[in-house]
Curated annotation (Swiss-Prot):
Localization, UniProt: Cytoplasm
Record: residues binding GTP: 166-173, 191-195, 213-216, 280-283, 309-311
Name assigned to this protein: GTPase Obg
Requisite cofactors: Mg(2+)
Gene Ontology terms describing biological process: ribosome biogenesis
Amino acid sequence: MKFLDQAKVYVRSGNGGGGCVSFRREAYVEYGGPDGGDGGKGGDVWVEAVEGLNTLIDYRYKQHFKADTGMHGMGRNRTGSGGEDVVLQVPAGTQLLDEDKEEILADLTEIGQRVLLARGGDGGKGNSHFKTSTNQAPRKTIPGWPGEERWIWLRLKLIADVGLVGLPNAGKSTFLSVVSKANPKIAAYPFTTLYPNLGVVDLGPGSRFIVADIPGLIEGAHEGAGIGDRFLGHIERCASLIHLIDGTQDDVVAAYKTVRGELEAYGDGLPEKQEILALNKIDAMDEAMVAEKRAELEAASGKTVMTLSGVSGDGVKALCGSAWDIVLQNRRAEKAAAEAAEKGEEGWAPS
């Protein structure tokens, strides 16, 4: 399935059905009076986050969504049926923006979360509403109210526990394919990964987390260089980062600083995320070279640097274990915060 993280769609809710002109006609009832029913309400347009989706590709080929019009009222004071709603299904992590992309209308971060995009028009009034002492047979009705229409942008920011970052050819796709059942494209040239890939790492019962392989960043990515600008936003949802560095390149410190610089320039909390720094491709290096480049990275970053090889598998399990420790820590913190907030709401009372 192709990946698409932005789509522009047009939505229109249904018009309300019109009120009815009708008069009671029954045997032995000489003056039946008006009995025109009201029109039905027009259908609404909703957007809902559902399970099993991780792309907006469905909205590349279909961009117009219109709900049904409400049925007109009928005689014997029967109200027309309401128009059928339209529900746009999107992945969790989808943001809704107005047409000029300046205002975020909603952020769907949880499965089942729903937002009303366009409310259907109310139904009109039948002639039974307009009977008076001086007008026993009114022919007046009120038509249904029109629906709403608008253009909106859907923007997906993947929700993952860990984001894989690094320069092109750092070995991120190979690592993801080894630790999960994901099947990203792998080749020995830059920008093999053109779109984010998701994989589930399973370390045992109750020890699973999601990893997002973010396409390779280059210097100037935050300004639109390369392909990194569009996908830096996906890292915002990740609780932590694994920063892979190709150990076979000449200057590993420069590679580290380039990616860190892009994260800091982009902002939005990216520089503050917990980061695991790892020197990759040690299968193509001797022990002395590994030790030398590891020491250079530790001196430049002030962090402990892990070593691994996605090809041979050396160090992969240890790296996943470290990532899981951070994921578990973050989940516990989120749970504690949610419980504290819930407790605070329960304990609130008007003064």
